[in-house]
């Protein structure tokens, strides 16, 4: 595929960050409404039940999203073929996963959903096929660099989540069931729209291409362990808090996570845009792009973390109310880990783009083991503060391990990878001017 110039890439990044900022605003609005109207106990259950389909999908999605990008960008696979295979996999995996959940519900679902009615758990599980669609088909938009539709899907989902939650809990005086139902409907609607958008790019159907399918699953098997370990690393603390403590503590911790999530949108947006470019580059170019991206991403993330350290405590109590003040301490303890997550997110894209997922897998599994061990030791003793500390330590370990391997393989230096340069800062006005010029050109064309 033809490479886009740097001004266009910056425009993609700024567009994605802008859409993520909208997600943050509406996400905070949704979080504030649910926190204030559901109360800590039901807010905690709401968090676990919404997270459940995400985790189940990560257990079963087989790394197909990363493989879709790799095969379209690196192997030149037909977008329609990849999309058709993805649809077949969505249906097959959903059926198998839901059947497994039904059979094993007392073993691996009930221990983490204590206090939730079985009907609520069943309602949450209806999101599984739509979460799979989101994973597989967003990756196709990412591969073809259609970031406009990619961004709109997320924005629509956030806006309608806020609106439906407001209607369910304010206008209809609903409780937990109404909040859950509203989110399931939004998830379904947003991802049916996503299918329509991909079909506009490349018409697809319910058919299977064995050659592309086998290659996708072989590549995905490597990414699968990486993404599964990464998801569990990021979310297992919620489940362990639910297991060891109570839904109320889950609510406090989830509020702390929600408050710091806006910082992670920086590295996530940049990583999303840079990944297809890395996948289409030579190793030398990929290493150079990665080092530059790491410097800019860390710089922006550190500035955001410093800002949070100064105003985060006051903002949390103003937004969520004084009864959520116990979330302040874990929020502050998370900040060093958030900085290291940003480095981790960029470096994993480099290794995946070069079909070196084994490096990511080793780092993710090692960090997951450390995180799990520390959580089991610290949560019973220190509560949710122990969970925040565990995450900070384990992500620091994972990021440093990836950095060590990246430096060895690329020939870059640690300083050249993580410390912002004067020339980097000097490039901002030029890149912004180029992005602005392209934006004005796009508007002129639209007219």
Segments the model singles out, each with a brief description of its role:
Residues 50-58, 253-275, 300-304, 334-341:
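Transmembrane helix-bundle signature of multi-pass secondary active exporters and lipid flippases
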Residues 27, 60-77, 143, 256, ...:
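Helix-loop junctions and terminal segments of transmembrane helices
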Residues 118, 122, 151-200, 366-370, ...:
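Hydrophobic alpha-helical transmembrane segments
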Residues 41, 105-124, 310-339:
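Interfacial segments at transmembrane-helix termini and the short loops linking adjacent helices
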Residues 6, 71-74, 130-155, 336-363:
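Membrane-interface junctions at transmembrane-helix termini in multi-pass inner-membrane proteins
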Residues 1-5, 9, 148, 152, ...:
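Interhelical loop/hinge segments that connect adjacent transmembrane helices in multipass membrane
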Residues 11-23, 49, 58-106, 115, ...:
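Membrane-water interface segments that mark the loop-to-transmembrane alpha-helix transition
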Residues 7-65, 94, 102, 162, ...:
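Signature of the first transmembrane helix
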């Amino acid at each position: 595929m033809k490479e886009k110039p740097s001004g266009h890439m910056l425009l993609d990044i700024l567009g994605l960050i802008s859409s993520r900022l909208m997600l943050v605003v509406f996400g905070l609005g949704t979080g504030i409404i649910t926190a204030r109207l559901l109360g800590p106990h039901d807010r905690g259950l709401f968090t676990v039940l919404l997270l459940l389909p995400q985790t189940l999908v990560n257990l079963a999605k087989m790394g197909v999203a990363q493989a879709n990008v790799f095969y379209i960008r690196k192997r030149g696979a037909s977008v329609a073929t990849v999309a058709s295979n993805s649809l077949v996999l969505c249906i097959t995996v959903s059926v198998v996963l839901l059947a497994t959940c039904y059979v094993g519900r007392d073993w691996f679902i009930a221990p983490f959903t204590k206090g939730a009615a079985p009907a609520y758990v069943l309602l949450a599980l209806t999101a599984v096929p739509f979460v799979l669609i989101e994973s597989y088909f967003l990756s196709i938009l990412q591969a073809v660099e259609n970031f406009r539709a990619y961004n709109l899907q997320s924005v629509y989902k956030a806006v309608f989540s806020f609106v439906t939650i407001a209607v369910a809990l304010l206008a209809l005086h609903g409780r937990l069931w109404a909040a859950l139902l509203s989110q399931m409907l939004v998830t379904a609607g947003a991802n049916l729209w996503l299918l329509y958008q991909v079909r506009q790019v490349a018409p697809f159907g319910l058919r299977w291409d064995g050659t592309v399918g086998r290659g996708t699953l072989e590549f995905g098997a490597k990414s699968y362990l990486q993404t599964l370990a990464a998801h569990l690393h990021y979310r297992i603390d919620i489940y362990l808090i639910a297991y060891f403590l109570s839904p109320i503590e889950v609510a406090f911790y989830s509020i702390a996570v929600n408050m710091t999530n806006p910082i992670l949108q920086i590295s996530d947006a940049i990583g999303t845009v840079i990944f297809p470019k890395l996948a289409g580059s030579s190793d030398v170019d990929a290493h150079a792009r990665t080092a530059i991206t790491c410097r800019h991403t860390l710089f922006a993330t550190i500035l955001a973390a410093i800002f949070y350290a100064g105003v985060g405590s006051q903002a949390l109590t103003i937004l969520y109310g004084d009864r959520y003040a116990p979330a302040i301490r874990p929020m502050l303890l998370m900040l060093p880990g958030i900085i290291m997550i940003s480095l981790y997110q960029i470096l994993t894209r480099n290794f995946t783009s070069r079909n070196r997922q084994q490096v990511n897998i080793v780092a993710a599994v090692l960090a997951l083991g450390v995180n799990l061990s520390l959580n089991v030791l610290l949560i019973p003793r220190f509560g949710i503060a122990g969970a925040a500390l565990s995450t900070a330590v384990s992500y620091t370990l994972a990021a440093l391990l990836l950095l060590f391997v990246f430096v060895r393989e690329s020939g870059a230096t640690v300083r050249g990878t993580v410390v912002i340069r004067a020339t980097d800062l000097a490039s901002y006005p030029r890149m912004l001017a180029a992005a602005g010029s392209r934006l004005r050109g796009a508007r002129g064309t639209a007219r």
